[in-house]
UniProtKB/Swiss-Prot annotation:
It comes from Mus musculus (Mouse). The gene is Tead3. Interacts with YAP1 and WWTR1/TAZ. This is Transcriptional enhancer factor TEF-5. Residues 28-104 bind DNA. It holds the Pfam family TEA. Residues 1-34 are annotated as: Disordered. Transcription factor which plays a key role in the Hippo signaling pathway, a pathway involved in organ size control and tumor suppression by restricting proliferation and promoting apoptosis. The core of this pathway is composed of a kinase cascade wherein MST1/MST2, in complex with its regulatory protein SAV1, phosphorylates and activates LATS1/2 in complex with its regulatory protein MOB1, which in turn phosphorylates and inactivates YAP1 oncoprotein and WWTR1/TAZ. One of its GO terms (biological process) is positive regulation of transcription by RNA polymerase II. Expressed in embryos as well as in many adult tissues. Residues 1-12 have a biased composition (Polar residues). Gene3D superfamilies: 2.70.50.80, TEA/ATTS domain (6.10.20.40). InterPro entries: TEA/ATTS_dom (IPR000818), TEA/ATTS_sf (IPR038096), TEC1_TEAD_TF (IPR050937), TEF-5 (IPR027253), TEF_metazoa (IPR016361), YBD (IPR041086). Residues 14-28 have a biased composition (Basic and acidic residues). One of its GO terms (molecular function) is DNA-binding transcription factor activity.
Length: 439
C-alpha cells in the first residue's frame, strides 16, 4: 500500500483564545447556590420528570390543574423531603447551575483545537439555550442511556438534520427540529447482532439466481456498496502495547462485516441536501461529487463513538484506522479521507491500495493507517469535556468525508459521509447507515 501523509488546509494551532469574553461577563461574581444533598437529589429527579416548557403550564391529569414547571419542581421537593423551596428559589437555583454549566462549556471549548470561528459558533449555540434547557440537557444525559440508533420512518424535509433532539416529554415545535433517529423517552438498547466472519462474493450471480433476486445480490441496497465497490469493515482505534506479546485495543468506532438476507429491509434514505453545509463546498466537495454521481455510491453513517476507554494511555499509544473493501473487478483504488470542522476541510489523507485476489473476489485492505495529529488531539480534548452534551455539541460540527475512486479512470466508486455523537451505551460504539438520495 502506498500512502501519503496527512496534509492540513490551515494550522489547527492558529486559533486565538479571545473573542468570547462577552459571554463570560457577569458569571464569575454570582454566588453558587448550594442545597442540602436530599433537596438537590429531589431537585435533579424533578428536572428529569418535568421537561422545560417555557411560559406554558403543565396540567396534572389527576388534579386537572395547571402549574408552571418551577412550581411543580418545588412541590416535588416538598413531597420528597418535607422541606420547602419556593418557585422563585427553584428558578434562581436553575440559573446558578446553568451559569456553572456554561462556564464549564466555555472552558472546554477554549481548550479544543478549533479555529476562532468554530469556537464562536459553538458558544453561540450554547447561548441560544435557556437556563432550563441547559440544566435539563445535562440531567437527561446522565439519567438515560443514548437513543437506540434506529431510524424514524419519516422526518420533515424542512427539519435540520443537526439540531438537538426534543427534550423528554416534549413534542418538537417551531424551534425544535428532528434528527432522523428515534428519540424514545426511555430508550431500550437492542442486543447487537453477532459479528459474521463471512460475506457474499461480489462476483456476478448465476443466471438462475440472478432472475430469482432481480439480478441484485442481497447486500445491494442493504450495505455500504455501490455497483463497483463494497465496504466490508471500518474501524478507528487506539492500541497500547503492554509487553512484547500483549496489546490492548479500544475501538472508538467500528463497522463490522455483515451478511444481509433478502428479508432484511433496505437502507433508509436521507436527502443529501440536508448535509451539504457540513462538508466542503469547493471543488471535490459533497455537492459536486453527488451531481457527478453515480447516485448509488453515496452513503451516510451516523456513529455513536465510544470514548470510555479503560486502557491507560502511554507515550507508545498508537491511534489508527483500518478499512477493507471488496470488488468484482481488479482495480487500483485511491482513498481520500477529509476531516472537516464547520464544513471546512482541516486535513486530508490520500492512500492508494491495490487489489488482492481472494476466493474469487478482489479485496483491498488499508491496515493500521496512522491517525493524523489533529485527530489525536481532538479526541484527547473531547474526552476531557465534563458533560456528554458538551461533547455532542462539539461533534455536531465535526464530520469526515471519505471518497474512494478508481486511480486509473477517476470514477467515483464510493462516498461515505461520517457524522458523530458520543455513545454512553454499555455496548460501546454503535452506528447506523443511510443511503443518500436527492428527491
Amino acid at each position: 500500500m502506498a500512502s501519503n501523509s496527512w496534509t492540513a488546509n490551515s494550522s489547527p494551532g492558529e486559533a486565538r483564545e479571545d473573542g468570547s469574553e462577552g459571554l463570560d461577563k457577569g458569571l464569575d461574581n454570582d454566588a453558587e447556590g448550594v442545597w442540602s444533598p436530599d433537596i438537590e437529589q429531589s431537585f435533579q429527579e424533578a428536572l428529569a420528570i418535568y421537561p422545560p416548557c417555557g411560559r406554558r403550564k403543565i396540567i396534572l391529569s389527576d388534579e386537572g390543574k395547571m402549574y408552571g414547571r418551577n412550581e411543580l419542581i418545588a412541590r416535588y421537593i416538598k413531597l420528597r423531603t418535607g422541606k420547602t423551596r419556593t418557585r422563585k428559589q427553584v428558578s434562581s437555583h436553575i440559573q446558578v447551575l446553568a451559569r456553572k454549566k456554561v462556564r464549564e462549556y466555555q472552558v472546554g471549548i477554549k481548550a479544543m483545537n478549533l479555529d476562532q470561528v468554530s469556537k464562536d459558533k459553538a458558544l453561540q449555540s450554547m447561548a441560544s439555550m435557556s437556563s432550563a434547557q441547559i440544566v435539563s440537557a445535562s440531567v437527561l444525559q446522565n439519567k438515560f442511556s443514548p437513543p437506540s440508533p434506529l431510524p424514524q420512518a419519516v422526518f420533515s424535509s424542512s427539519s435540520r438534520f443537526w439540531s438537538s433532539p426534543p427534550l423528554l416529554g416534549q413534542q418538537p415545535g417551531p424551534s425544535q427540529d428532528i434528527k432522523p433517529f428515534a428519540q424514545p423517552a426511555y430508550p431500550i438498547q437492542p442486543p447487537l447482532p453477532p459479528a459474521l466472519n463471512s460475506y457474499e462474493s461480489l462476483a456476478p450471480l448465476p443466471p438462475a439466481a440472478a432472475s430469482a433476486t432481480a439480478s441484485a445480490p442481497a447486500w445491494q441496497d442493504r450495505t455500504i456498496a455501490s455497483s463497483r465497490l463494497r465496504l466490508l469493515e471500518y474501524s478507528a482505534f487506539m492500541e497500547v502495547q503492554r509487553d512484547p506479546d500483549t496489546y490492548s485495543k479500544h475501538l472508538f468506532v467500528h463497522i463490522g462485516q455483515t451478511n444481509p438476507a433478502f428479508s432484511d429491509p433496505p437502507l433508509e434514505a436521507v436527502d443529501v441536501r440536508q448535509i451539504y453545509d457540513k462538508f466542503p463546498e469547493k471543488k471535490g466537495g459533497l455537492k459536486e461529487l453527488y451531481e457527478k454521481g453515480p447516485p448509488n455510491a453515496f452513503f451516510l453513517v451516523k456513529f455513536w463513538a465510544d470514548l470510555n476507554s479503560t486502557i491507560q494511555e502511554g507515550p507508545g499509544a498508537f491511534y489508527g484506522v483500518s478499512s477493507q473493501y471488496s470488488s468484482a473487478d481488479s482495480m487500483t483504488i485511491s482513498v481520500s479521507t477529509k476531516v472537516c470542522s464547520f464544513g471546512k476541510q482541516v486535513v486530508e489523507k490520500v492512500e492508494t491500495e491495490y487489489a488482492r485476489l481472494e476466493n474469487g473476489r478482489f479485496v483491498y485492505r488499508i491496515h493500521r493507517s496512522p491517525m493524523c495529529e489533529y485527530m489525536i488531539n481532538f479526541i484527547h480534548k473531547l474526552k476531557h469535556l465534563p458533560e456528554k452534551y458538551m461533547m455532542n455539541s462539539v461533534l455536531e460540527n465535526f464530520t469526515i468525508l471519505q471518497v474512494v475512486t478508481s486511480r486509473d479512470s477517476q470514477e467515483t466508486l464510493l462516498v461515505i459521509a461520517f457524522v458523530f455523537e458520543v455513545s454512553t451505551s454499555e455496548h460501546g460504539a454503535q452506528h447506523h447507515v443511510y443511503k443518500l438520495v436527492k428527491d
